Swiss-Prot record:
ATP-grasp domain ranges (all copies): 110-297
Pathway listed: Purine metabolism; IMP biosynthesis via de novo pathway; 5-amino-1-(5-phospho-D-ribosyl)imidazole-4-carboxylate from 5-amino-1-(5-phospho-D-ribosyl)imidazole (carboxylase route): step 1/1
Pfam families linked to this entry: AIRC, ATP-grasp, PurK_C, RS_preATP-grasp-like
Keywords: ATP-binding, Decarboxylase, Lyase, Nucleotide-binding, Purine biosynthesis
Record InterPro entries: Ade2_fungi/plant, ATP-grasp, ATP-grasp_carboxylate-amine, ATP_grasp_subdomain_1, PreATP-grasp_dom_sf, PurE_ClassI, PurE_dom, PurK
PROSITE patterns named in the record: ATP_GRASP (PS50975)
EC number: 4.1.1.21
Catalytic activity: 5-amino-1-(5-phospho-D-ribosyl)imidazole-4-carboxylate + H(+) = 5-amino-1-(5-phospho-beta-D-ribosyl)imidazole + CO2
GO biological process: 'de novo' IMP biosynthetic process; purine nucleobase metabolic process
Name of the coding gene: ADE2
Name of the protein in its database record: Phosphoribosylaminoimidazole carboxylase
GO MF terms, alphabetically ordered: ATP binding; metal ion binding; phosphoribosylaminoimidazole carboxylase activity
Species name: Candida glabrata (strain ATCC 2001 / BCRC 20586 / JCM 3761 / NBRC 0622 / NRRL Y-65 / CBS 138) (Yeast)
Class in the EC hierarchy, top level: lyase
Family the entry assigns: In the C-terminal section; belongs to the AIR carboxylase family. Class I subfamily.
């Protein structure tokens, strides 16, 4: 796929999963880290470098063997990277040393974001002294968060100062570190998103994720985030704008807070694959790890490559941490996961230690409710008396993926559009039905239309009244055939809807049926599906034969008893 060698600073689980993605694409990777680190365990290259990614000589040794260098952790020696880049002028380093330097010092990162007008929680620099923190408490109020500027992750660099009495504990907890203080953010949800930045500066977003933390460590990720579309859109724009402000390319994890007043502030950025993006391995078209490789090697990034696999894809990621009391207890969770349809287990080749990340489990289903149900079983929250019924549910046949999307601008259109649904049910066509307003939810409409192909939708039936822009706008954004249903409104008897849908410009066709006749839309959709599935052709032939038989029976009856008795019998 690419003849260049990628050198990775760091051989932990993130490096391991980058290597897994690289192996599928025949991309050679070399690792700088300790012997037998997780990433080195799965590649038999003889020229890995044993050493530290914070040591200049070791970085030089790796640089001499690779064409492109990247990181799986930002805690590297940036000055060494800059010197190595001068020493090896053909070597490409992504993210750039400049970007890593801006991000690895979290206070510098915050100042950079403020400069680029990205909303963040207010923060100030502090000295490592009780007097300085007393002043900070007066300035920011209690509680506030004391944070290490560098070498901090998984909550290990944070200390919540609830009152003046906590100051000395905080200084002891974060001793000998450069510090800053952050105002307490009263948030109701933590959100995260993976953003890809290409070599030419374009950015691509993965779905917004809701993260649940336990003891300051990511415990669960829910995808898509359980927040309104408007919140997801705001979070996506904020994250994209933040990443646009940094030079270079690669994947970035962006963490955000959804505050009590529904505003969003950016918490922090990681210039690498991120724990909250592990779900992408099973739930998305391209995983975060492959996307990172595509970015740093300037490989193709096709349309919708960061999308969920289907419109009905839901996922939960569960982190596996070493149990503080029972060694290898997490393996019991893995055992239950192996018995669970839609669950995938990823172990990192690390010795189990208390609260150490040793793996994760991805659960992918067609609904969040089903994901939650399976999560409960995997975590052992379901008791034995109902275990059998739970397993029956888990092993139930998956709902077939929809082939037809039935959409409408308002629930007031549902009585009309339900006829199309009934027709699809009659022909045993799997379909989905939802509300997508061209005027009130334009971003949702755009997402629905642009992702239709990747989700396996073959035909879209769109009903709309009045201005009736929905069918035409959807047809403009997807190669999937669109059938328009003019819905009769309170004025103009639906003629306005008919004209809006049928009068499409050349190049953007909409197959338009009669006013309020979604029955025909359903039948037409089945005929379209019959082009690729002969089962639907046979069912359509049976349907037509049945119609003919009904008409012939009526004709025979009319001819036999005469029109007057026929009318009386109806």
């Amino acid at each position: 796929m690419d003849s260049r060698t990628v050198g990775i600073l760091g051989g932990g689980q993130l490096g391991r999963m980058i290597v897994e993605a690289a192996n599928r694409l025949n991309i050679k990777t070399l690792i700088l880290d300790a012997p037998n680190s997780p990433a080195k365990q799965i590649t038999n290259a003889s020229d890995h470098v044993d050493g530290s990614f914070a040591n200049k000589e070791d970085i030089e040794a790796l640089a001499a063997k690779c064409d492109v260098m990247t990181v799986e952790i930002e805690h590297v020696d940036v000055n060494a990277l800059k010197e190595v880049q001068k020493q090896f002028p053909k070597l490409e380093i992504y993210p750039t040393p400049e970007t890593i330097g801006l991000i690895q010092d979290k206070y510098v990162q915050k100042q950079h974001l403020v400069k680029n007008r990205i909303p963040v929680v207010p923060s100030i620099t502090v000295e490592n002294s009780k007097e300085s923190l007393i002043k900070t408490g007066s300035s920011l109020g209690y509680p506030f968060v004391l944070k290490s500027r560098t070498l901090a992750y998984d909550g290990r660099g944070n200390f919540v100062v609830k009152s003046e009495e906590d100051i000395e504990k905080g200084l002891e907890f974060l001793a000998n570190r450069p510090l800053y203080a952050e105002k307490w953010a009263s948030f109701k949800k933590e959100l995260s998103v993976m953003i890809i930045r290409s070599l030419d500066g374009r950015v691509y977003s993965y779905p917004i994720v809701e993260t649940i933390h336990k003891n300051n460590v990511c415990h669960l990720c829910y995808v898509p985030a359980r927040v309104p579309d408007s919140v997801q859109h705001k979070a996506k724009l904020m994250a994209e704008n933040a990443i646009k402000s940094f030079p270079g390319c690669g994947i970035f994890g962006v963490e955000m807070f959804l505050l009590d007043d529904d505003s969003i502030v950016l918490n922090e950025i990681a210039p690498r694959p991120h724990n909250s993006g592990h779900y992408t391995i099973n739930a998305c078209v391209v995983s975060q790890f492959e996307a990172h490789l595509r970015a740093i090697l300037d490989l193709p990034m096709p349309k919708n490559f960061t999308s969920l696999s289907t419109n009905s894809t839901n996922a939960i990621m569960l982190n596996l941490l070493g149990d503080p009391e029972t060694k290898d207890k997490e393996l019991q969770i893995c055992e239950r996961a192996l018995n669970t349809p839609g669950a995938s287990v990823y172990l990192y080749g690390k010795e189990s230690k208390p609260n150490r990340k040793v793996g994760h489990i991805n659960i992918v289903c067609s609904s969040m409710k089903e994901c939650d149900k399976r999560l409960q079983f995997i975590m052992g929250l379901k008791t034995d008396p109902i275990k059998h019924s739970v397993m029956e549910i888990l092993n139930a046949e998956e709902v077939r993926k929809p082939l037809v999307g039935v959409i409408m601008g308002s629930d007031s259109d549902l009585p009309v559009m339900s006829a199309a649904c009934k027709m699809l049910e009659q022909f045993e066509v799997p379909f989905e039905v939802t509300i997508v307003s061209a005027h009130r939810t334009p971003y949702r409409m755009n997402k629905y239309a642009s992702e239709a192909v990747s989700r396996g939708i073959k035909v879209i039936i769109a009903g709309a009244g009045g201005a009736a822009h929905l069918p035409g706008m959807v047809a403009a954004m997807t190669p999937v055939p669109v059938i328009g249903v003019p819905v009769k409104g309170s004025t103009l008897d639906g003629v306005d809807s008919l004209h809006s849908i049928v009068q499409m410009p050349r190049g953007v066709p909409v197959a338009t049926v009669a006013i309020n006749n979604s029955t025909n839309a359903g039948i037409l959709a089945v005929r379209m599906l019959g082009i690729h599935n002969y089962d639907y052709v046979k069912k359509m032939e049976e349907f037509l034969n049945k119609q003919e038989e009904e008409v012939l029976q009526k004709a025979a009856k009319l001819e036999s008893i005469g029109y007057e008795k026929y009318l009386e019998s109806k």
